[in-house]
UniProtKB/Swiss-Prot annotation:
Organism: Mus musculus
Record text on subunit structure and interactions: Associates with NXF1, NXF2, NXF3 and NXF5.
Subcellular location(s) per record: Nucleus; Cytoplasm
UniProt-listed Gene3D superfamilies: 3.10.450.50
Highest taxon, organism lineage: Eukaryota
Record protein name field: NTF2-related export protein 2
Length: 142
């Protein structure tokens, strides 16, 4: 029974970290995009609608070329990733979906998945993005 309680605590901690991360990520994306790369690991990979971007410099260039955005998150889910699958690195899978407008234009539905890893600093633990997959979910006209 103690194992189940410990896992529940682990899940609760992961969800709190995910909620905090999502608030920071989308506020930074909308209002301070130049600072967004600080949330990524040095060798992080972004897949944006099938286009692969790897490394901080490439990420900074990619985010700089995107038009201004207004994200609204409608759904958030998270779960810890078992440490056997991540070489004992504390990792959380975060899944979001919602709507976004770029340059105030047409609203698009989107889905975004993040793999966050815990990075220890002398004073705290910081979550960094190892992998990020963004995809529009718009349906074609039927």
């Amino acid at each position: 029974m103690a194992l189940a309680v410990n896992f529940k605590t682990y899940v609760d901690q992961a969800c709190r970290a995910a909620e905090e991360f999502v608030n920071i990520y989308y506020e930074t994306m909308d209002k301070r995009r130049h600072a967004l790369v600080r949330l990524y690991l040095d060798k992080a990979t972004l897949i944006w609608n099938g286009n692969v971007v790897t490394g901080l410099e490439a990420l900074a260039n990619f985010f700089e070329m995107l038009p201004s955005s207004e994200f609204q998150i409608n759904m958030l889910d998270c779960q810890p990733v078992h440490e056997q699958a991540t070489q004992c690195q504390t990792t959380v899978l975060v899944v979001t979906s919602g709507v976004v407008k770029f340059d105030g234009n047409k609203q698009h539905f989107f889905n975004q998945n993040f793999l966050l890893t815990a990075q220890s600093t002398p004073n705290s633990t910081v979550w960094k993005i190892a992998s990020d997959c963004f995809r529009f979910q718009d349906w074609a006209s039927i």
